[in-house]
């Protein structure tokens, strides 16, 4: 196991499914229709569903295609957060959270790239996928539970509008013509288990 593997595995989410659901509901309550936070919540749900699609694939071609869709939405979302939301966190006197968020997302993207080098139907692939998913779920929990809710409360309406415009601009710039493809990743129903979306089964 590489150093990055160990880092990702070490942050497998300690929080429960109930805690993650509560964090998401808290963030939904703070969000406004069409704003940057509601867009991020939608993208988080799409990422969770994309992980589940990768895990559920039954042949190499299906898994490779699902992996590409996961990488697409995860990278587009990460780029938009890193360009717009994390700098806003830093400006709101949350430099520690901003730095931690950058570090976690960089590790997840690096690991997802390495995952693509493994045989897609192997147990090594599934183990690494689960480590990455666990790290991403924990990262999402941090953002939804406090970081982004606090940011939403600290900023004025003009700043909120600018964040919304810039976040979607960066996301759509990366996704390009693939935005409809990503939209085809159906978010999990509200109330569905977040933590067990892609957990491995005995083989």
Give the location of each predicted region:
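Small-residue-biased structural context
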Residues: 1-203
